[in-house]
């Protein structure tokens, strides 16, 4: 995206990057996936407070602009994307070399095609 934006101003702007419709999950399902991939002792509990502001139970990014302009499609399904996100945050929590972790994840991602 950045390379195209540098070459041609018609690509300027912002783009949402997210899952296909078939991979959209509720916020609770997303939390469940995070806990599953983090492992013990991770847990979460849905506790609604009486006067709390409304929280959306389902959030979705509209990636139509990105798909139309670049022919983009997600490579990882939601489970894999969450697993890789958890892996990165675990590396951060363990004070690992985040540059190395990030570069490895990029290599893995680019090798999927």
What name fits each language-model region?
Residues 7, 19-23:
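Glycine-rich "substrate-gating" loop/helix at the edge of Rossmann-like oxidoreductase active sites
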Residues 14, 51-73, 92-94:
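Conserved C-terminal active-site "lid" loop/helix of NAD(P)H-dependent oxidoreductases
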Residues 78-113:
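Amphipathic terminal alpha-helices
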